[in-house]
Amino acid sequence: MNCLYQRDCLRLLDFTTAELKHIITLSEKLKKTKQNRQEIKLLKQKNIALIFEKESTRTRCSFEVAAFDQGANVTYLGPGSTHLGTKESIEDTARVLSRLYDGIQYRGHNHKTIEILAQYSTVPVWNGLTEKFHPTQLIADLLTIKEIFPNRNFSDIKCAYVGDSRNNIGNSLLEAASIVGLNLYLVSPKQYWPEKNLFIECKKIIKKNQGNIICTENISEGVKNADFIYTDVWVSMGEHHKIWKERIELLKNYQVNDSMIKMTNNSKVKILHCLPALHDQKTSIGKSILKKYGLKDGMEITDNIFQKHQKTIFEQAENRLHTIKALLVSSLIKEMNF
């Protein structure tokens, strides 16, 4: 029987090394079948609930297209369209949806909510993003890394994550690196290093997988000889403007720009970004933030670097679809002959 059948995905430490690599391998296969228009609909007569307390582009589209490609039906429950935690308890919502659906995706503010959903649900629950973790993004990132270096072990690859290392991407990247043995440098001011207990937990795991995790404030040390530089936006729209000012001031030297690229000593270094990116002033939010804080050329990444590396960044975005599809198939199909 498929060992991932009926399994939740709340965080990447829910999986063993073999299980996570299986999902990545299945993602590669499903990507090829879609590209070759040979997709087999394995999820016919399956129904999936998509709970979005936070708005989304890539995550929602990826879950919906993945489900449709595989023959499943979805119900989108957007912000304000459920009674979750207000008129109806999270526990009761989980019990009700489990009677109607074969799986539940949740994207919201509080990780505790998805833990309760999973506890009281009798069907798989998948984390589309919480304030603590973003596992589906990191599975896509690992697929992207593997596609770029198909013949290298993760333990032979160095990834430098620059910016806020304690956010959900930083946390999930820490977990991903520990499971597959990626050499990860978290390049941030000390205030933005990961939570201590999570770091210690991942440090223990990565020793078994031949990789390493290092936190440093030193940008040149952190990015030297990196195969990948990964960044993310520094501010969230739900945070107070006072936090923005403090964070931008502390992180402005950690912008991915020409100077940082030179520090890598690697002319072939690749850039990863989970998107959306504040690299120009073509959005109302981007224009407002960059003008308000005197940022002339992007925030976390300059437009020049973003455009040079857009092929990798948008391949990374597309891979959300294929990896989420692999996650759905893995947890909803009992016997897999694929």
Swiss-Prot record:
Species per Swiss-Prot/TrEMBL record: Buchnera aphidicola subsp. Schizaphis graminum (strain Sg)
> GO biological process: any one?
citrulline biosynthetic process
- Give the record's keywords alphabetically: Amino-acid biosynthesis, Arginine biosynthesis, Cytoplasm, Transferase
* Enzyme Commission code(s) on record: 2.1.3.3
Q: Pfam families annotated for this entry?
A: OTCace (PF00185), OTCace_N (PF02729)
Gene3D superfamilies membership: Aspartate/ornithine carbamoyltransferase
Kindly provide the name given to this protein in its UniProt entry.
Answer: Ornithine carbamoyltransferase
The family note in this entry says: Belongs to the aspartate/ornithine carbamoyltransferase superfamily. OTCase family.
* Catalytic activity reported: carbamoyl phosphate + L-ornithine = L-citrulline + phosphate + H(+)
| GO MF term list | amino acid binding; ornithine carbamoyltransferase activity
Which gene name belongs to this protein? argI
